[in-house]
Every structure is written in structure tokens, then in C-alpha cells.
Amino acid sequence: MKYVVIVGDGMADYPVESINGKTPLMVARTPNMDWLAKHGSLGLVRTVPEGFNPGSEIANLSIFGYNPLQYYTGRGPLEAASLGVELKKDDLAFRCNLVTLHSQGSKVVMEDFAAGHISDAEAHEIIAYLEQEMGTEEIRFYSGLSYRHLLVMKNGGSVCSGLERLGLTPPHDIIGQEIAPFLPENKDSGRRILTLMTESQRFLKEHPVNLDRKAKGLRPANSIWLWGQGRSPQMVTLKERFGIDGYVISAVHLIKGIGLLAGLEVLQVPGITGYFDTNYEGKGEYALRGLEKKDFVYVHVEAPDEAGHMGDLRLKVEAIEVFDEKVVGTILKGIKDFEKVKVMLLPDHPTPLSVRTHTAEPVPFVIYSNETGEKKHTADTFDEVSALKSGLFIEKGYELIERFLIRNPGSHE
């Protein structure tokens, strides 16, 4: 049996008044996802357990089959795995965003959590500069992609125990808001984080990359923002649990990191960016190549989530339609060559246009198998309303992978 998981990041949404109370999934043209709904088993799944922040790290851990309560230690260490950064027992890894802060009178506002989606080359130059100017034996900067980077604090978990438990807000949760209420207190462990972020602003203010960006009318990367800290998690691999080998396909270090910790191999696809200009078709084509060699492929596409964060309805509908045509469509066409195959498709979490950040509501999922005789919960369309009407609901999202890999997808037990 061959298995494909396809994740459209942040596709789910709330009803939008301007499109007659429908969601982007409902108005987008998605013949391939709708085909899966008609021939598979449709339902709702809670990927974010109650009490957890609805981050992609939590939701994708659940989809991969890992209970966040047991395995989640922070977003930073998951991204460290993708970057090949080895963490020792007491090392703390922080997600390090390049952001754009803007002064409005006496207030400082989070203008852009992604620094205008700064290019990889520009970001690499900035992170290398910060490592040169701010890096020490204790503090190390590692370059990722675009605005997504890593800061590792050596022995941070033992030198200052409060750092690990410090509540740090993801910058995409506070777009357009004053940052002061979301900064850690200026004492003990919080002071160390404040000092690093403030110091970065001094170094970045007149950096050549930012001067050039401002001259072009682009948003500068004028600060770092630290969050998502934690130690390296100890995870049982999918091969140990289910006896399968496979690949993960994503431009996002977080997803690749989870895949690596789950024992998968990263399948490198040329031209993937984690943005609207990604190589959608290449992801589908490489997923099929992966299935020729191994049993399992996890395909992740970031674009719908980015549109949600921007609050742009047109872009979100377009991203969903391109995802359906070039990723889902390519995979559905190619899997006809395999004798036995199962497909699971879902968003990881909603990223509603009205709030421009992640939320924790259950999301629609569909499981399709080309084997006959499996009980199904079918519908005409793949969307939030059809999934709700199906009557199939998975409360513990991390159990969905077992339903996909082991059990009949339509059963309620």
C-alpha cells in the first residue's frame, strides 16, 4: 500500500460576508478535492488540542500522529532538526523571525511578521551579520529561509530555567498591534530576550540590506522576534510505529523538522519557496516519484496560510485553486499507476481572513482508498460545512494517522 498525506496549510476559514457567508474553500474551484470528497470518507478533526496555541507545529505534530501533550517542547527545536542543528540536552532553540516594527507616536507596532517576505539572499546576509556582531559561545544564529530563522542558546535550559517556560507570543498573532503588551517582563529570563531583540534593532537600523529595501519602498527587517523556544524532543519514528519509510516535501523548516524527527527523508524539490510563487506542480510530481521508491509521502503547501495572514480573500481563493489543480490534481492523476493507494487531505488549522492568524477549530479532512469495500462518508464538496454534515468527527487529531494507516477510514470506533 502507498500512502500520501496532502496538507493545505491554513485553508480552513470562517464564513465571509462578502461572498454570501461562504468560506474560501466553498467558493474556490476545487474539482480534485471535491472528487476525493465524493469517493472517500469526509469528516472533521481537531488537530489542536484544547489549551494549546493553534500553531502549525501543534497541528502538524497531530497530523503526523504525535500527541502534542507528550511530544511538543517548542517550535524552535523542530526547526533546528530541519537545519541540521544538533541540540544538546540543555540547549534551547528559539524561532527567530525577521520582522518589521513601526513607530506610531509613542507606540511600536508589529507592522509585518515576515519583513515584507524578505528574500533568502537578503535574510542570509542579515543573519550572518547578526551572528558576527551578536553571536557568542552561548548565543548562535542560524539562517533559514526568508523571514524564518533560528537562535540557539547553549545550555539555556540549565543556566536560566525560566527561559524554557517564558511565554513568548508568535509575531503573526499580533499583526498591526502594539508590541508592548506582548513583550516579556524586563527581569530575569525575560530581560535576556528583551536585550537580544533590542540589540538587534540597533544593528539592523542602518544595515545595507535594509537601506536598499527602504529605497525600493520595501519593508525593512528592522528587528528580530524570538519565540517558540524548547529543547529537542524525543520522538518514536513512523517506521518504529507503523513499519513505513517515506519522505516529507515542504519549503517550511518546521514541517521538514517534524518529518526528520519522525524518521522521514526530506525530498528536495527545486523552486519551492513557502510562498505564492512556489513550484506547486513540482511538489506533486516529486511526491509521485517518492511513492515509486517508498511507501509514504507527506506533502505540505504553505500558500493558503500566507493569504490568510494577509487577510486577502482573492489571494486565498487563488492559492486554494492552484493547490487543487497543480498539487492535488497532479497526485490524483499519477496514483492511478499504483495498485493500492490511500490519500489523506486536510488543512492543518484554520487561518481565517477576518483575524489574520491561526485558530483552533476542527478542520475538514478526507481519506480516500482505491480499494473497494471500505465504508465511506461521502459528500459532493470538500469544505467545512460538508465535513460538519458528515457526522464523522475525530476529537484526538493525533489518532487520525492510525485511522489512515491502519483502520477503515469510515468507521466510528
Residue ranges of each PLM-predicted region?
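Feature captures the catalytic ectodomains and active-site-proximal regions of enzymes
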Residues: 1-413
